[in-house]
Amino acid sequence: MSGAGAPGAAERIDGTGLRVVIVAGAWHEEIANGLIAGAERTLEAAGASWSIARVPGSFELPVASKAALEAGADAVVALGVIIRGGTPHFEYVSAAATDGLTRVALNTGKPVGFGVLTLDDEAQGLDRAGLPGSTEDKGAEAAHAALATAVALRALRG
């Protein structure tokens, strides 16, 4: 299982006062909706306020995440689904989303929870989407990472 050794996503984080935007791609709707639901559950449990911004796909996640953070969000949870096909498109989109989201976090100084699934097939996504029968909940994990980092940055910055 790819989630083996993950930090304690069940650890309670106090997200009171944090404004978080879930930025989610629309491709592979069933998986994407599962990721969103997991992120929502985590943010709700932490007491954070949140909203959702939908974008066409994972390639658009960085620019929308940057806009959300520049508009005042304390953190972003970026969720997307990229499934390998028969062309190099998978590699280009995966690299662009990953590199772009990393730059957004570094340039804004605000956390971006990375919930972009890069998959060989749809079954892998369904297994990670936090749906009934899934073994993992990557949407919840990405939201937890964004919240935990926002809290840590708040403490570091005094």
UniProtKB/Swiss-Prot annotation:
Catalytic activity: (2S)-2-hydroxy-3-oxobutyl phosphate + 5-amino-6-(D-ribitylamino)uracil = 6,7-dimethyl-8-(1-D-ribityl)lumazine + phosphate + 2 H2O + H(+)
EC number: 2.5.1.78
Active site, renumbered: 89 (proton donor)
Residues involved in (2S)-2-hydroxy-3-oxobutyl phosphate binding: 86-87, 128
Domain of life: Bacteria
UniProt-annotated binding residues for 5-amino-6-(D-ribitylamino)uracil: 27, 58-60, 81-83, 114
Pfam families found in the cross-reference section: DMRL_synthase
This protein's GO CC annotations: cytosol; riboflavin synthase complex
Record keywords: Riboflavin biosynthesis, Transferase
GO BP terms: riboflavin biosynthetic process
MF term (GO), any: 6,7-dimethyl-8-ribityllumazine synthase activity
Function: Catalyzes the formation of 6,7-dimethyl-8-ribityllumazine by condensation of 5-amino-6-(D-ribitylamino)uracil with 3,4-dihydroxy-2-butanone 4-phosphate. This is the penultimate step in the biosynthesis of riboflavin.
Protein's name in the database: 6,7-dimethyl-8-ribityllumazine synthase
Lineage start: Bacteria, Bacillati, Actinomycetota, Actinomycetes, Micrococcales
